[in-house]
Amino acid sequence: DEVRWSPGFNFNARFFDRIFLTEPDRGDWESMIKLIQDSLTDEAIERAINQWPENVYAQTGEKTINTLKARRDNLTDYSMEFYESLAKRVNVLGTDKKELFLIQNLSKDKVRVTVHKLSKKGNIEQVIYDRTFTSNDTKEIRIYGFDEEDQFKISGDVKSKVNVRIIGGKDKDEVFDLTANGSAKNVKVYDRKSTKLGTSASSFKSRLSNNPDINNYNKNEFKYDVLLPLVNGSYNRDDGVFLGGGFMYTQHGWRKEPFASRHRLMANVAVATGAFNIEYKGDFTNVIGQWNLGAVIDIKKPEVNNFFGLGNESFYDVD
């Protein structure tokens, strides 16, 4: 009856969900959960399952009713765990038409993103996206403008803890820093060198390039972070059998392939002598520009010394 890990339960829709479930916030999810729970009464569930053919109901009817009731009762826990997985890093997608993207640093913990459609003459039309992000739920927002000449305006009087990436398109975009006191430092801009970046006083960071890859959007980019257990066994004539284990933890990040970081920790101990070794290996992608970083820490405590003295007259002590 239990859904052990709801983000994994929705594995097959992991790309779809990160395209079409980017606007609802925590309050929207909580409202929808309550609506579903109020609608799925015990009577409604029982009435639906009781319509099954008798031979089918006899096999799984009661179990299905109990499972549905249990999942309804626990829907808040399952759904909010899934929401938190989706909300951690959010893609805000424009279209191949002109848009105005407003990024407002409301406070150090809140950022509001609003997307307006622009007419061919540049007049502001209807809102096509509006969401206020909180730092408790969201660590990073990635805004993709795509084609046509888009405008991005950053405003607010305080730097937010929510990081924002603006990824423009192949046409001439405009990015304006309307903040006070350099409050756009949480924003990074990725676009062509033809992009207009407002004034020289802009406080956001920019990475401009004529390489078309700078504007790339990969709808299948999402990967789950993975924690794997490791086991190990070995043997040598001095210490005998070594047994041990550890873990490997892989984290993924934006435009970091094949991963952002990978940590591997192993520990082994000799059953007979008590000798042990501990090894940590870390790999980090694109730490500085295109430069990667690797780190290795190896700790050993041997219990056997095979040094018997200098020269050819030394005696081999078997013990």
Predicted regions and their residues:
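C-terminal catalytic region of ATP-dependent kinase domains
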Residues: 1-130, 136-142, 148, 154-163, ...
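A residue-identity detector for tryptophan
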Residues: 5, 29, 52, 254, ...
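Acidic, aromatic-enriched beta-alpha/helix-loop junctions
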Residues: 129-141, 145-146, 259-273
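Hydrophobic/aromatic-rich, well-ordered segments within soluble, folded domains that form packed cores
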Residues: 133-149, 240-252
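Outer-membrane beta-barrel initiation region
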Residues: 155-156, 167, 174-301, 306-308
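Flexible, surface-exposed loop regions and adjacent strand-edge segments
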Residues: 310-318
